C-alpha cells in the first residue's frame, strides 16, 4: 500500500531544529505555534537538516543556508491563508485550530509517517473515509 503526503514543515510543539541551531536562527511564535527560520542568521551548518525526522529544512546551495516552510507567517498576520492553502487545487490543505479541532477521521501519525510523539507535530491527516454500505431491506 502506498501513501502520499504533502509535507513542508510540521511546526512541531517541540521542534528539534530550534534546539540544535547554534545561532538561534529558529524561533517559535507563541500566538500560533509557527516555527520561523530566520535565514539571515543561518550559517549553513546543517544541524537542523540532520535533526529533523520529517526532512523539513533543506540546504539551499545558492544561498549556502538552510530554508524551510515559514507557514507564510506574513500572510497569516495579514489575515490571509498561506500560499499552499490558497493555491491547492483540491483544497486538501487547510489551517486548523488544534484546540478546537475535532475530526474523528484525522490522525497525527498516518501509516508511513515518522512517529515522533516527543516533537508533537501540529500536522493532522484526514484518512480516507470508508464508503457507506447500503443494504436492501427484505420486503
Residue ranges and their predicted role:
Residues 1-139:
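Non-ligating segments of multi-cofactor redox enzymes
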Amino acid at each position: 500500500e502506498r501513501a502520499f503526503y504533502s509535507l513542508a514543515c510540521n511546526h512541531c510543539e517541540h521542534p528539534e531544529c530550534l534546539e540544535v541551531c547554534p545561532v538561534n536562527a529558529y524561533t517559535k511564535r507563541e500566538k500560533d505555534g509557527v516555527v520561523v527560520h530566520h535565514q539571515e542568521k543561518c550559517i549553513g551548518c546543517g544541524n537542523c537538516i540532520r535533526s529533523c525526522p520529517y526532512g523539513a529544512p533543506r540546504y539551499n546551495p545558492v544561498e549556502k543556508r538552510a530554508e524551510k516552510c515559514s507557514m507564510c507567517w506574513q500572510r497569516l498576520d495579514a489575515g490571509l491563508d498561506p500560499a499552499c492553502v490558497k493555491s491547492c487545487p483540491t483544497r486538501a490543505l487547510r489551517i486548523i485550530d488544534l484546540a478546537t479541532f475535532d475530526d474523528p477521521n484525522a490522525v497525527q501519525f498516518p501509516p508511513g509517517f515518522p512517529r515522533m510523539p516527543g516533537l508533537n507535530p501540529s500536522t493532522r491527516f484526514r484518512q480516507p473515509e470508508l464508503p457507506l454500505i447500503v443494504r436492501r431491506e427484505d420486503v
